[in-house]
Design a protein with these regions (language model features):
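Conserved redox-cofactor binding core of oxidoreductases
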Residues: 2-15, 114, 135-195
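N-terminal glycine-rich phosphate/pyrophosphate-binding loop and immediately adjacent elements
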Residues: 5-128, 133-134, 139-140
């Protein structure tokens, strides 16, 4: 049992009756039925699953990685990378120029990344409109949905002063005339310990 004063959402969910099947422990095929099956439990999958379940649909989420609880986090990067990230945090872009820290655990990248939260940028929405026929995906049409999720996920301005490297980045951006501000984060009870 954890001695942390911060509640463990995984343990709370299991206590409420979450049905979890660890595929790594199965020794026979199983048949499951649902109205909707969602592949991936990251930001998009998790929010979609909750929205659909609240509307009365039965939902199954299929996740490649394991379910980890607060008690499973030992604050050791050597253990975290192989157990929580795709390709042990070695995934890269095709040209190998950029590392991609993509989660491979329940919660996906929302479990392992820094909780930065921002609305889909207008140029991205415009790209989706032009290339995927999503004409209704405008900032105005999505604003109430963004607001609903921001409230649900406790998204707010990060009030902790930036560390020196981020402050230097902010000052440099200001000198170049580039707008810069503290990023919005989805946190509740964060102690800013660096983990």
């Amino acid at each position: 049992m954890s001695t942390s004063p911060i509640p463990d959402p995984i343990q709370a969910g299991l206590a409420r009756g979450w049905k979890v099947i660890d595929g790594a422990t199965l020794d026979a095929s199983r048949t499951l039925e649902a109205d909707v099956i969602i592949i991936g439990s990251g930001a998009g999958g998790g929010v979609t699953a909750e929205t659909l379940a609240k509307s009365g649909l039965s939902v199954i989420i299929v996740e490649e990685g394991a379910l980890k609880s607060s008690k499973d986090f030992k604050m050791r990067e050597a253990e975290a990378y192989p157990s929580l990230y795709q390709e042990s945090a070695a995934r890269k872009t095709k040209d190998k120029a950029i590392n991609i820290l993509q989660g491979r655990t329940v919660g996906g990248s929302t479990t392992v990344n820094w909780t930065s939260s921002f609305r889909t940028p207008t140029p991205t929405l415009q790209y989706w409109q032009q290339h995927f026929g999503l004409a209704g995906y405008t900032p105005e049409a999505l604003a109430p949905w963004f607001l609903m999720m921001e409230q649900r996920l406790n998204v707010s301005t990060w009030l902790t002063p930036p560390n020196e490297n981020n402050d230097l980045l902010k000052r440099g951006a200001a000198r170049l005339g580039i707008p810069a501000a503290a990023i919005m984060r989805n946190v509740k009870g964060c102690w800013n310990l660096g983990y």
